[in-house]
């Protein structure tokens, strides 16, 4: 386990990017070689505009972050009285000063696979190294004289514990005798229902509007890889918006004129917040309520990023009681959970919180298929194997025709060699005779590229699924594979785990594991079953590809290498069967 952790930590993201580029180039060589180096052998075949909304398009930051003494989270949590949160998926607390949701830990996910690893901290209070919290409040209009709760207000709770079976009410009464209530309830996963209430017990009308805000102080460390989005995410007016933290800094700075129209929006329903690779925190307004949305960057000693919305103006007469509802999701972006919320709570396009990429029409089905197989197999490694078999069955007709053509090409090797010897100095005549031979025997020299060409989008879709979906996070296979989303942990430089050596990062690419070696061997064996390319240069390049792919895939997720290896084994079996059948037919 220690060797595994050390090796995985040494493979930094720059190396991952280089590996990703290398495999793309290698696949391109396989598929398009004959196009890049052609030979004459063959010819390549808003609806809420009338509602009364708060006049401000930006939520004033109620709490400006200033340079302060950073304290451990435990010390900060001990300062104020809190309501504890306990569910099968979350632990944490709500700060009764300000009614701030600022303490959440994911119960089922750890930072690493070490036995003593801490659980993932999602939200943290102000005063810690990386504050990240959610506020709920009210703002008054113009010369509104009513006393409103703020971030210094001390709320009273009717219960000390928030659980799936026990909601809580936080209440505060102003000097004007107006009562403000915030009701929190939570399900067994990651969804909070939050209702803000106001009871006007004064003798005058209240003109106020609600706001909800997510704030993140300090720029979080991101993976910064082009196939993954981390930062602001929102769906307003059915338009998915993804902006990184630099975009907010450059275009939505609170201290400068707003540069981009995305910083403010009007809409109804949807969701908005911040996303990491595997986790996110988003506000989910009532789908029937119009809202003003804004996104901002600020800096008062530390960079801060906030997103939130304000609701419509409430004119509350004496004796009247109003409610403002909405939800908060704070947790892991698990596909089945997001799908359930989409269906049961009608949260639009909620599964798009997972970064499916440009080819979502492929990536989503791949993810759903693997999760479906996992439901029966109980192991994601077995699910990947089952998915590979399914793909082979779907592509069987194409692969069968391709392998038949390659088998015919292999059978024609002696005839092709004789033509080369017959016309050593007349290449044009030799090519004409070769074309006639191919036509007579029904062989296609480029047919072998077709199955590979079809596999490319499947390969990259699986890569994306392994990279961005939390289902693969720390998902074990069998034996030495403890995490299918990480590279094979046993490498040749550690004698496959027999030597305790912390391999330097620059040597990680040659610290080839067992699965990549198996993949390379199966690829080499598969090539041996194919006819040798007629062009000597092409033959040399193809001969090197198993070695290139072995090194390239050594740094990729074990689940991806498992897919490739199983796919090679199935291809070998299919090729061997077809060639045996053709040979038997000709005997």
Model segments located where?
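Helix-loop-helix
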Residues: 2-53, 94, 196-197, 209-226, ...
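Generic detector of low-complexity/intrinsically disordered segments
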Residues: 5, 55, 150-153
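Aromatic/His-enriched, Gly/Pro-containing loop or helix-boundary segments
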Residues: 14-17, 74-75, 157-160
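Non-transmembrane, membrane-proximal soluble domains of secreted or membrane proteins
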Residues: 64-81, 88, 268, 300, ...
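Generic structural signal for short, solvent-exposed loop/turn connectors between secondary structure elements
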Residues: 65-68, 73, 164-167, 178-179, ...
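Soluble non-transmembrane domains of integral membrane proteins
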Residues: 82, 86-348
């Amino acid at each position: 386990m220690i060797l595994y952790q050390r090796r995985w930590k040494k493979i930094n993201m720059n190396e991952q990017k280089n590996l990703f580029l290398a495999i793309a180039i290698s696949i391109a060589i396989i598929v398009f070689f004959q196009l890049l180096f052609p030979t004459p052998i063959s010819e390549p075949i808003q609806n809420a505009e009338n509602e009364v909304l708060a006049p401000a398009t930006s939520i004033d930051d109620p709490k400006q972050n200033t340079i302060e003494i950073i304290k451990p989270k435990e010390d900060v949590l001990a300062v104020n009285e809190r309501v504890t949160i306990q569910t099968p998926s979350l632990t944490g607390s709500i700060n009764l000063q300000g009614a701030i949701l600022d303490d959440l830990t994911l119960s089922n996910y750890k930072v690493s696979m070490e036995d003593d690893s801490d659980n993932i901290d999602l939200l943290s209070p102000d005063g810690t190294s990386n504050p990240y919290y959610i506020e709920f409040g009210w703002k008054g209009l113009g010369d509104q004289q009513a006393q409103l709760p703020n971030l210094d207000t001390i709320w009273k709770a009717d219960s000390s514990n928030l659980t799936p079976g026990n909601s809580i009410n936080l209440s505060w009464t102003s000097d004007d005798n107006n009562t403000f209530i915030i009701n929190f309830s939570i399900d067994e996963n990651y969804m909070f229902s939050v209702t803000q209430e106001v009871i006007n017990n004064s003798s005058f009308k209240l003109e106020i509007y609600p706001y909800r805000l997510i704030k993140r102080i300090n720029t979080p460390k991101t993976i910064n890889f082009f196939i993954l989005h981390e930062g602001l995410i929102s769906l307003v007016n059915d338009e998915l918006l993804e902006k990184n933290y630099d975009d907010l800094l450059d275009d939505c700075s609170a201290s400068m004129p707003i540069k981009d129209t995305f910083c403010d929006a009007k809409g109804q329903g949807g969701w908005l917040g911040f996303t990491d690779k595997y986790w996110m925190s988003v506000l989910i307004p009532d789908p029937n309520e119009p809202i003003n949305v804004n996104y901002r960057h600020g800096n008062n000693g530390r960079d801060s990023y906030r997103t939130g919305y304000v609701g419509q103006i409430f004119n509350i007469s004496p004796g009247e009681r109003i409610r403002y509802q909405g939800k908060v999701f704070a947790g892991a972006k698990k596909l089945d959970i997001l799908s359930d919320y989409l269906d049961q709570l009608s949260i639009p396009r909620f599964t798009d919180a997972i970064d499916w990429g440009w080819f979502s029409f492929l990536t989503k089905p791949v993810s759903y298929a693997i999760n479906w197989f996992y439901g029966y197999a109980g192991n994601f490694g077995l699910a990947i194997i089952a998915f590979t078999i399914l793909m082979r069955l779907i592509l069987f007709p194409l692969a069968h025709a391709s392998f038949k053509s390659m088998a015919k090409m292999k059978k024609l090797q002696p005839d092709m060699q004789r033509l080369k010897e017959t016309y050593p100095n007349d290449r044009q005549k030799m090519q004409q005779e070769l074309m006639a031979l191919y036509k007579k025997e029904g062989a296609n020299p480029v047919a072998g590229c077709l199955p590979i060409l079809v596999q490319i989008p499947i390969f990259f879709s699986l890569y994306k699924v392994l990279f961005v979906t939390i289902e693969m996070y720390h998902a074990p296979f069998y034996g030495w594979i403890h995490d299918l989303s990480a590279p094979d942990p046993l490498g040749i430089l550690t004698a496959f785990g027999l030597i305790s050596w912390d391999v330097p990062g620059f040597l990680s690419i040659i610290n080839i594991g067992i699965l990549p070696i198996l993949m390379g061997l199966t690829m080499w064996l598969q090539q041996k079953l194919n006819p040798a390319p007629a062009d000597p240069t092409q033959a040399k390049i193809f001969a090197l590809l198993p070695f290139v792919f072995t090194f390239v895939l050594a740094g990729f997720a074990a689940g991806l290498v498992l897919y490739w290896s199983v796919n090679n084994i199935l291809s070998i079996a299919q090729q061997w069967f077809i060639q045996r059948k053709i040979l038997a037919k000709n005997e």
